[in-house]
């Protein structure tokens, strides 16, 4: 089975070809429309996804009821709410499609079965989780150590699809700024591109 979505497994050097094939076969192709929820607050996640095509985001509602984007998922990334899926608890987050999306999905029971059957999958899982921990830690530090402009440029460099397809309000909440501030940052970058 050939799909760029599975590159995340192929990049792990220890999988044998037959293990990869079994993992790939365990994924089901699913399609969601723009605005569809993959997971809603209060529900328990029962599957994880690999985003094959499109753009999705996770968000929480703050104490005032405002949506705050916690993550943007781009093509070939794993879309998961780790705490809910593995601890079997209701999530505080929502995951929604910003555009029409195509995914590869694996349910929790199938994942658990393969995780215990294929030793390399558990090794891959540990490596993936530690890498995600690093990414989230780095993001939490950058909120305090980088200017809003630098955070915007960083997002533009890492995930240009977000800038292209996500509404301004969602990007602003992810960066920790107001819509007005983000509009000003964008205007400054257009009129003075060399300053940053």
Name every feature range the model reports, one short phrase each.
Residues 1-28:
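Cyclic nucleotide-binding regulatory module and flanking cytosolic helices
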Residues 4-7, 132-141:
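Short, Lys/Arg-enriched N-terminal segment that forms or immediately precedes the first helix
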Residues 69-126:
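Cyclic-nucleotide recognition modules
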Residues 38-43:
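Short phosphate-coordinating micro-motif centered on Lys-Gly-acidic
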Residues 146-196:
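Phosphate-/nucleic-acid-contacting segments
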Residues 64-67:
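Short alpha-helix-to-loop micro-motif enriched in aromatics/charged/Gly
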Residues 35, 46, 50-57, 75-76:
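Glycine- and acidic-residue-biased ligand/ion/polar-headgroup-sensing regions
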Residues 28, 37, 55-60, 78, ...:
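Short beta-strand segments in beta-sandwich/barrel cores
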């Amino acid at each position: 089975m050939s799909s760029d979505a599975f590159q995340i497994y192929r990049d792990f050097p220890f999988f044998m070809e037959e293990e990869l094939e079994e993992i790939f076969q365990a994924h089901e192709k699913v399609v969601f429309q723009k605005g569809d929820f993959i997971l809603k607050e209060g529900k328990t996640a029962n599957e994880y996804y690999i985003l094959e095509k499109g753009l999705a985001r996770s968000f929480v509602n703050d104490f005032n009821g405002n949506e705050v984007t916690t993550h943007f998922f781009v093509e070939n990334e794993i879309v998961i709410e780790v705490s809910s899926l593995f601890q079997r608890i209701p999530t505080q987050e929502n995951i929604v499609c910003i555009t029409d999306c195509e995914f590869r999905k694996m349910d929790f029971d199938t994942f658990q079965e393969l995780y215990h059957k294929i030793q390399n999958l558990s090794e891959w899982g540990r490596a993936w989780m530690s890498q995600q921990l690093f990414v989230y830690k780095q993001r939490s530090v950058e909120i305090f150590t980088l200017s809003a402009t630098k955070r915007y440029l960083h997002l533009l460099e890492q995930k240009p699809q977000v800038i292209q397809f996500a509404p301004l309000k969602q990007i602003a909440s992810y960066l920790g700024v107001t819509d007005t501030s983000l509009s000003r940052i964008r205007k400054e970058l257009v009129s003075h591109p060399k300053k940053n």
